[in-house]
Swiss-Prot record:
Part of the gene cluster that mediates the biosynthesis of the indole diterpenes penitrems. The geranylgeranyl diphosphate (GGPP) synthase ptmG catalyzes the first step in penitrem biosynthesis via conversion of farnesyl pyrophosphate and isopentyl pyrophosphate into geranylgeranyl pyrophosphate (GGPP). Condensation of indole-3-glycerol phosphate with GGPP by the prenyl transferase ptmC then forms 3-geranylgeranylindole (3-GGI). Epoxidation by the FAD-dependent monooxygenase ptmM leads to a epoxidized-GGI that is substrate of the terpene cyclase ptmB for cyclization to yield paspaline. Pathway: Secondary metabolite biosynthesis. InterPro entries: START-like_dom_sf. This is Penitrem biosynthesis cluster 1 protein I. Gene3D superfamilies: 3.30.530.20.
Length: 153
């Protein structure tokens, strides 16, 4: 077993509750996250997600289109959000992915938004296979798009 972590952060000129509400509404990811091409699943995709929500995200990474079946695992309102692949989902070489969002208030009207993705892979995964899951430019583009969307309102 092997794992690797991608982490990025950005300062957004909005309070933590605004950033939290936006990014935990998974239907907002379409058109904001560069790899997200669609979201399907349980009722509640168009409002703040709650623990136990399951949904399927269609992802396109450089022409490789696949679906991930996510489940919201943990949350602390306006502070922390975590979702991961259920244990019955396997997408070689990755057998588990955990994504966390941390919302760190800076004063009254700014938030440090930190996104971390941990991928657990088979020991024999090649560097090329891992690269598709560790594209930090894509993660940074997502945070920049969240910032742009929230700060224009």
């Amino acid at each position: 077993m092997s794992s690797f972590k991608s982490q990025c952060e950005i300062i957004i000129d909005k309070p933590a509750h605004v950033v939290y509400d936006f990014v935990t509404t998974v239907s907002n990811w379409i058109g904001i996250h560069p790899a997200c091409k669609g979201i399907e699943g349980d009722d509640g995709l168009d409002k703040e997600a709650t623990v136990g929500l399951r949904f399927t995200e269609t992802i396109d990474v450089r022409g490789w289109v696949f679906q991930c079946h996510w489940e919201v695992r943990k949350m602390v309102k306006d502070q922390y959000f975590e979702f991961s692949l259920p244990t019955d989902f396997i997408l070689p070489p990755v057998y588990n992915t955990i994504i966390t969002y941390i919302f760190d208030p800076i004063g009254d009207n700014k938030t440090r938004f930190i996104r971390t993705m941990i991928n657990c892979t088979n020991a024999d995964a090649t560097p090329e296979q891992k690269a598709d899951f560790a594209d930090t430019d894509m993660h940074t583009d997502y945070l920049n798009a969240v910032k742009a969307r929230l700060e224009m309102s």
